[in-house]
């Protein structure tokens, strides 16, 4: 897939370590691309689960993917503030069909009041055994949890209110063209 440009719509696919498709988002709008990162927005985006169930995202969400970090970030813009869902995942890669990454189960959720919660630790441990995650992979993921927490605590990138506001404003401008 050639690098998408601002205003393009792309498909995002998450996989599990064993190569099975986990979840697909249709029509994510690209807001910015750089050599290493893609910023987009999901707003009433169709999501298809691996079992065929479908649902639509409820609110606008700024999505951040990077080629060097082992996480991606979803900033969900709600009436009472921004909440975040962070997936520990492989750096993204793209082909002619979609932006793709491997989801490694561990998640961090940040609520609008700032509360942070690690999620799915048991699922990660179960899949680590079942899918034979290497010690190196386990180390990388745990180190990137530390990097992610430093970003959260320091309001870096997507965790800055200004960042969310800038990209949401750009989305509204593109949507209303």
Swiss-Prot record:
Needs which cofactor?
Mg(2+)
User: What is known about what this protein does?
Assistant: Has nucleoside phosphatase activity towards nucleoside triphosphates and nucleoside diphosphates.
**Presence of keyword Chloroplast:** no
* Entries under HAMAP family matching the protein: Ntdp
Q: Name one Pfam family in it.
A: DUF402
Q: A Gene Ontology molecular-function term?
A: magnesium ion binding
Q: Which NCBIfam families match?
A: PRK13662.1
Question: What InterPro entries does this protein map onto?
Answer: DUF402, FomD-like_sf, Ntdp-like, SA1684
What is the name attached to this protein's record? Nucleoside triphosphate/diphosphate phosphatase
EC number in record: 3.6.1.15, 3.6.1.6
Top-level class of the enzyme under EC nomenclature: hydrolase
Active site annotated at which positions? 23 (proton donor)
| Sites where the protein binds Mg(2+) 1 | 87, 103, 107
């Amino acid at each position: 897939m050639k690098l998408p440009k601002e205003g393009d719509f792309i498909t995002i696919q998450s996989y599990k370590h064993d190569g099975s498709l986990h979840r697909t988002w249709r029509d994510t709008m690209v807001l910015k691309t750089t050599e290493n990162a893609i910023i987009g927005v999901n707003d009433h985006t169709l999501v298809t689960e691996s079992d065929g169930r479908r649902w639509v995202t409820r609110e606008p969400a700024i999505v951040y993917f990077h080629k060097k970090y082992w996480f991606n970030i979803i900033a969900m813009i709600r009436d009472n503030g921004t909440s975040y869902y962070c997936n520990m995942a492989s750096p993204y890669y793209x082909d002619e069909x979609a932006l793709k990454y491997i989801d490694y189960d561990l998640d961090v959720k940040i609520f609008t009041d700032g509360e942070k919660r690690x999620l799915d630790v048991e699922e990660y441990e179960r899949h680590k055994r079942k899918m034979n995650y290497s010690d190196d992979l386990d180390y990388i993921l745990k180190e990137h949890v530390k990097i992610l927490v430093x970003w959260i605590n320091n309001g870096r990138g997507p965790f800055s209110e200004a960042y969310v506001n800038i990209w949401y404003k750009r989305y509204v401008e593109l949507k209303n063209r």
